Structures are given as structure tokens and as C-alpha cells.
Regions:
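N-terminal nucleotide/polyanion-binding subdomain common to many enzyme families
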Residues: 15-90
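S-adenosyl-L-methionine/SAH cofactor-binding core of RNA-modifying enzymes
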Residues: 76-124
């Protein structure tokens, strides 16, 4: 019995879930609803869930940033809201990978993309 590509994708390839934590999740919606990512979502290959870091912010104003340690220009993301969000997500399911984005991190390339494609649940 021959199966369609849609059937194979839906029933034999496990769905991947990517949770993205962002200070501005609305800015992420548009690029994630077009092109290859849109088709992957429509075919049930990937589920992408955006999380607003401000929901985990500190104090009355839900603060997620702080001044740079040691002075200097700019702001940095506080660790408490990030850890609170990640811990909540980890309580809901098992994650294969948690990726912390930083300016001096590893370059995302095809090799990294291939390795991540083998993971089922990822937090970025």
C-alpha cells in the first residue's frame, strides 16, 4: 500500500516543538508565518510557541532588563525572568536542548541546523 507524502510526514515523522522566549514576541510572529517555516507548521512538522519574557518580569512593572554590571552603556537581560520561564517550560515537558542566545555564541550554520533537526523539543 502506497502512502502519500502528507501521511508519511504526519504519522511517521515526530512533530518538533520549538519554544522561543522573547522580550518582543510579536516581532517574531511575521517571519515565523511565512515561507518554509509556514509550510512546516501547516504540515504538522513543527510547532513554534512564542513566550513573552515580560510575563516573568520582576516587580510592579515586570522588569526584565538591568544595567550593565560594572557600568557602561546599554542594558542586559536579567537572569531571573529567563530562568523562571525556562523552569516553567521544563515542568511541562522534557527538552532536548536549551539554547541561550548571546553575542559571542557559536555561529549558526548548516551543521548546527542538521544537529538541531534531530531534536524533538527545543527552547531558544
Amino acid at each position: 500500500m502506497a502512502h502519500s507524502t502528507e501521511w508519511i510526514i504526519r504519522y511517521l515523522i515526530p512533530m518538533h516543538r520549538i519554544d522561543i522566549i522573547s522580550v518582543q514576541p510579536k516581532l517574531m510572529e511575521s517571519p515565523l508565518n511565512h515561507s518554509i517555516v509556514k509550510r512546516a507548521k501547516e504540515k504538522g512538522i513543527v510547532e513554534i510557541v512564542l513566550h513573552d519574557l515580560k510575563q516573568y518580569g520582576l516587580g510592579k512593572y515586570k522588569q526584565v532588563d538591568d544595567t550593565v554590571y560594572g557600568g557602561g552603556a546599554g542594558m542586559v537581560i536579567r537572569c531571573e525572568p529567563v530562568f523562571d520561564c525556562i523552569n516553567k517550560l521544563k515542568a511541562e515537558r522534557d527538552y532536548d536542548e536549551v539554547i541561550y542566545m548571546c553575542p559571542d555564541g557559536e555561529v549558526y550554520n548548516q551543521r548546527e541546523a542538521n544537529q538541531l533537526s534531530l531534536k524533538k523539543n527545543i527552547i531558544i
